[in-house]
Amino acid sequence: SAPKPFQVSRPQRRTMLSRHFSSIVENLVGSGDSYAELSVERIITAGGISRSTFYSYFDDKGDLLVAMAQDVIGDLVGVGHAWWDLSPDATKADLRRALRLPINTYRAHRTIFGAVVETAAYDARVREQQQSLIDQVVASLADHITAAQKAGTADSTIDPKRGAQWTVWMLEHGLYQLVSSADETEVEQLLDAVTDMIWRIFYAGYRPEVG
């Protein structure tokens, strides 16, 4: 029998639409409006999508934000592995290179991440998604700290879970408050500062600072 034509599933179609809307929303917010100020009508008009199509896949613009954020959150968690996967003899320069990746990813999608932070204050769906991101990163960092402590390459007096919680929330707020609006020169200085802090907290005296 003839093969069936390729069909896009509903979840796949939702993902495709959310990716389409991501660039639309980034342009609209880049023009000066906050995500909260954007109406569904304005979003779908700019995106060239009918109202019926929009509501076939999204409950409202909060649901759209959850879908748009899913991709960029996955990217952010993915590049975080550059830090978790550092070898036991990784130097401070290696740490700096690893920390650059989430900073670059955040800057590339700062509009969506910023909308997540702002919308999480009043939309439980977005808040749950933000917390899920935090929980994933905290768990990964805590595992990394635990493994490094066992290997003798991180301060063994630090509580891995709570140390990870403090560090991740600090980074989350720093990305939103400091990195999102910084120019290239300032980003480099912020990267230097956060590398110094994390190195001193976890690794100083336990692994070589230079190779």
Give, region by region, the residue ranges found by the protein language model:
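C-terminal peripheral helix-coil segments that are non-catalytic and often amphipathic
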Residues: 1-4, 139, 143-150, 165, ...
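Short, amphipathic alpha-helix enriched in basic
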Residues: 14-40
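All-alpha amphipathic helical-bundle segments outside canonical DNA-binding/catalytic cores
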Residues: 93, 128-133, 150-166, 185-193
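Amphipathic alpha-helical linker/stalk segments
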Residues: 5-9, 21-23, 29, 68-95
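Hydrophobic alpha-helical connector segments
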Residues: 67, 81-108, 160, 164-167, ...
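Secondary-structure edge/capping motif, primarily at the C-terminal ends of alpha-helices
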Residues: 80-87, 113-120, 148, 174-182
